[in-house]
Structure formats: structure tokens, C-alpha cells
A protein has these predicted regions:
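Membrane-proximal interfacial segments on either side of biological membranes
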Residues: 1-229
Length: 229
């Protein structure tokens, strides 16, 4: 449903000052080949070379998404997109999440992840619908993350460490762009059967990682001999 405001020149062609306003309810948008956003509703305002979407709601592979505002500008052979995207607390499929953002933002060693987030992003979209120059800033409330433990060196210091490491109730700030990611976070960590505290700063540039991590182990015993010698 929409309203259309058009003006014509002397030759009967539509002028560039047109404006189309309206809304879509319970729509469906196919993206990324086999995937789609369902139950899609939003308000739109279309002008020449500029498109604005407000109050968007939709479901992507059982992930409930919402956005207050998305701005799209057409520039030559591509679209420049800037907006905000949120999801409520939910269990997230890792492959689905990575496909949504066109990359490998989440490690596939993650077995379970449950979080709510607010994300601000910019990217360009070409005619083949390929995402380029993605920049993403996220505020995340991480309720649970279970990570398959392949950190064999920890077993030298913490006897009988779990096969999977669990994070709970973390608050994270993530700044992502191509070949670069910064993560700052803090929350609970479960290495065995008791809870300790983990604080961390992680920087990745290309294939190089820089970790600044502090773990406050008050509940789980560690082997000091392994550390000292």
C-alpha cells in the first residue's frame, strides 16, 4: 500500500523529484540464493537515488530481526547501505549468522550461542547482490556460548578441564571491518563445574591476533608447578 507523487516534463517523462511512500506487511524477501526473510513488514519512502526503510520487522531462519532505520543510496553500479539491526535473545545457528553478513564473523568451533544484539552497519551491494566493504559495530548481550575446547595447553594448568568451555552473561563491544576485528568483553567463564570471571580484548588484523586477556580463577584449582617450571 502506498502513495505516489509524480511530476512529468514537457515530453511526458517522469521528473527526478518523484516520491513514493507506503508500507509492506507480511512480505517475503529472497536473499543469499537459498535464504529469505519472512514475515517482513516495514514503512518505505522512495526518492530518486535514495530509499529509506523504517520500522522493519522480519524473521530470518527463526532469528527475529528488527530495524528502526535503513538508508540506501544508489551510486553508479552499486548501492550504499547504512542502518541499524537488532535481534532479541535467541539461539543462533552459526552458519546462518555468517551467511547473513557474508563472511566468517563467528568461529565454527562454537557449538551453542544465545545472545541479543544491536548492530550499526554500512556496506555496499553490487548488481550481483554481493556485499562489499562491510563495517559493523555491535553491542552484544551474550547469555551463553559453548565453545569446543581445542586449547590443549590449558590442560597443563587446569586438570580435568571440560571438553567444552562455556561463557555466560557477557557484555561485548565488537568493531568489525574487512580483515580487521576488535572485541572487548567481560563475563563469566565455566572451565569445569564452577564459575570464574573473564575479561578480554582481542584484536585481529589479517591473520594476526593480539590478545589481552585476564581470567580470575577463584573457584577452579590450577597446577602452579606447570606455570612455575
Amino acid at each position: 500500500i502506498g502513495d505516489v507523487d509524480l511530476n512529468f516534463d514537457d515530453n511526458g517523462k517522469i521528473k527526478n523529484d518523484y516520491e513514493v511512500k507506503g508500507f509492506i506487511k507480511n512480505g517475503k524477501l529472497k536473499i543469499l540464493k537459498k535464504n529469505s526473510i519472512n514475515d517482513l513488514s516495514f514503512i518505505f519512502n522512495l526518492k530518486d537515488q535514495e530509499y529509506q526503510i523504517k520500522d522493519l520487522r522480519g524473521v530470518y531462519n527463526k532469528i527475529e530481526l528488527s530495524s528502526d532505520s535503513i538508508n540506501i543510496k544508489k551510486k553508479e553500479q552499486e548501492f550504499l547501505i547504512e542502518g541499524e539491526l537488532s535481534n532479541e535473545k535467541d539461539n543462533i545457528n552459526i552458519k546462518v549468522f555468517n551467511n547473513l553478513f557474508g563472511g566468517d564473523l563467528l568461529d565454527t568451533n562454537i557449538e551453542t550461542i544465545n545472545f541479543a544484539s544491536n548492530n550499526k552497519y554500512t556496506f555496499s551491494l553490487n548488481r550481483q547482490f554481493k556485499i562489499n566493504d562491510l563495517k559493523l559495530k555491535s553491542n552484544i548481550n551474550l547469555y551463553q556460548l559453548v565453545y569446543k575446547n581445542n586449547l590443549n595447553n590449558l590442560k597443563e594448568y587446569i586438570p580435568n578441564i571440560n571438553e567444552s568451555i562455556e561463557l555466560k552473561d557477557h557484555v561485548l563491544l565488537i568493531d568489525y571491518e574487512k580483515n580487521k576485528i576488535d572485541i572487548v568483553g567481560e563475563g563469566k567463564i565455566i572451565l569445569k563445574d564452577k564459575i570464574d570471571i573473564l575479561k578480554y580484548k582481542i584484536k585481529k588484523k589479517n591473520d594476526q591476533y593480539n590478545f589481552d586477556t585476564k581470567i580470575y580463577i577463584n573457584e577452579n584449582p590450577i597446577l602452579l608447578n606447570s606455570i612455575l617450571y
